[in-house]
């Protein structure tokens, strides 16, 4: 059940500290072991990247990033993170669909996500939301972890 006080909006620089904290709470799911506020501010300033936050009563409880290439109609989802106590309530799905709608409005037709193979919760989340496996990359990360690539075509999205 999604609380009514939920809001999704574009990232602003005041959110950087909250994103760093959220990342540190789930760092085992990310390729980067540690990130800084400067790192977040740098990627958020890219023209081909958008970061959205989801808030509950004004407090950041999750975020999603999208890297998009309008000229070729492709995008990549990631990172995505929801504070652990709010998982399983549809909040991540709402955030994902917000990002997918953003991409659809920009003419993106193909979206991928890459997930560490042992992150079964994320794999189930994306499969539940219509993504299908299309590739397996052995020792893909700096630490030698395997990664699974999933994809979804944007017109399949019920945004």
Model regions and ranges:
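Conserved GNAT acetyl-CoA-binding A-motif
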Residues: 104-114
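Conserved catalytic-core motifs of GNAT/GCN5-like acyltransferases
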Residues: 114-115, 132-148
């Amino acid at each position: 059940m999604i609380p009514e006080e939920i809001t999704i909006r574009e990232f602003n620089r005041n959110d950087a500290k909250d994103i760093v904290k959220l990342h540190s709470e789930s760092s085992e799911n990310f390729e980067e072991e540690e990130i800084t506020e400067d790192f977040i501010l740098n990627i958020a300033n890219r023209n081909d990247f958008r970061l959205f936050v989801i808030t509950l009563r004004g407090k950041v409880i999750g975020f999603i990033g999208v890297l998009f290439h309008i000229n070729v109609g492709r995008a990549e989802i990631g990172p995505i993170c929801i504070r652990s106590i709010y998982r399983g309530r549809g909040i991540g799905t709402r955030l994902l669909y917000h990002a997918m709608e953003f991409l659809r409005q920009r003419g993106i037709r193909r979206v991928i996500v890459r997930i560490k193979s042992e992150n079964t919760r994320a794999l189930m989340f994306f499969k539940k939301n219509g993504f299908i496996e299309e590739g397996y990359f052995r020792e893909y990360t700096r630490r030698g972890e395997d990664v699974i690539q999933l994809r979804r075509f944007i017109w399949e999205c019920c945004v």
